[in-house]
Regions:
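Bacterial N-terminal signal peptides
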Residues: 5-15
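Helical hinge/lid and interdomain linker segments adjacent to catalytic or ligand-binding clefts
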Residues: 20, 26-30, 37-123
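Extracellular ligand-binding/catalytic regions of CAZymes and related secreted enzymes
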Residues: 20-25, 40, 51, 81, ...
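Extracytoplasmic/secreted proteins, especially bacterial periplasmic and envelope-associated proteins
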Residues: 29, 40, 44, 99, ...
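Active-site rim elements
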Residues: 32-35, 91, 155-160, 229-238
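Catalytic beta-strand/loop cores that center a nucleophilic Ser/Cys/Thr
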Residues: 50, 56-58, 149-220
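A glycine-rich, often tryptophan-bearing local segment used as a flexible ligand/cofactor-contacting loop or short
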Residues: 88, 93-173
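Proline-centered loop/turn at the N-terminus of a beta-strand
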Residues: 113-115, 196, 222
Length: 273
């Protein structure tokens, strides 16, 4: 006759074995356009995120290297259906059609989290005077309202000193300040009220916000953004990929207060697509 203790162990083992695995977060990376090696960066980001968290990344890539790249994923009205988060890696400075921008923003306005990388901050410029601060709540400020920050350009590439200004935030907790390779430091024309600065970057005497969060619209959608990430070496840097992955998990509500993935969302829990 088997002992009660042995039966308990067997029962617990069977229960754990039968427990369904946590489904991975479904992320869509929209990437392509002007001025960057997106053919390489799409793979770096996809692999880097999936190695760090229980996330399945689909890629919507445009090989168009112009400033008005076309993305097939945006053609459907319900283009974001089935996804838990969208990563915007577009470089689409001259897409200024308000209807198109509203289509891109529609799921975020309803609560779908967003992550925005580097040149996404210089995309969807619907105001011809984007080089000056644009008022919130206007057609010209649509994309900036979503981001929580308005940037219009950058200077020459040189190393950026990264300083974490809020080391207690789950996204940045435990991270050490560092210096990038030669990179582009984006300017800040306006940091919106409600945006939370997490890090600043410095080149010489110029210092700007380079990492922040925002709550967008009435749904208070979680949005995470960083202006870092021009060069492949930076995008492939483990410190950068750690940041992006944490930002994604935070946006989805899957990052605990210590900066670790919540149960089931760490890399060991990942499953095949």
């Amino acid at each position: 006759m088997k002992s009660p203790a042995l039966l308990l162990v067997v029962a617990l083992t069977a229960t754990l074995a039968a427990a369904p695995a946590v489904k991975p977060l479904k992320a869509l990376l929209v990437i392509g356009g002007c001025c960057h090696d997106y053919a390489a960066q799409k793979d770096i980001l996809e692999g880097g995120i999936e190695q760090r968290a229980n996330v399945a990344v689909d890629v919507c890539y445009s090989a168009d290297k112009g400033t008005k790249p076309a993305f097939t994923c945006y053609e459907k009205d319900d283009w974001a259906a089935g996804y838990d988060v969208i990563l915007h890696g577009e470089c689409a400075a001259d897409i200024n059609d308000v209807a198109k921008i509203r289509r891109v923003l529609a799921p975020h306005l309803k609560g779908l989290p967003g992550v925005n990388l580097h040149c996404a901050m210089h995309s969807y410029r619907s105001d011809p005077n984007f080089q000056k601060p644009v008022a919130s709540g206007t057609d010209g400020g649509l994309w900036f309202d979503y981001l929580g920050l308005q940037s219009s350009g950058h200077g020459e590439q040189s190393p950026i000193e990264v300083t974490y200004t809020d080391p207690t935030h789950p996204i940045t907790r435990g991270f050490q300040n560092w210096t990038t390779i030669s990179e582009e430091l984006y300017n800040n024309l306006r940091v919106h009220q409600g945006a939370v600065t997490l890090a600043k970057g410095k080149q010489g005497n110029q210092e700007t916000v380079i990492l922040w969060t925002n709550e967008y619209g009435d749904a208070k959608t979680r949005v995470f953004s960083t202006t870092l990430g021009h060069n492949n070496e930076t995008v492939a840097d483990p410190r950068y990929l750690d940041l992006v992955t944490r930002g994604l998990l935070w946006a989805c509500g899957k990052l605990d207060d210590s900066g670790k993935p919540k149960e089931g969302y760490g890399p060991a829990a990942g499953t095949a697509k």
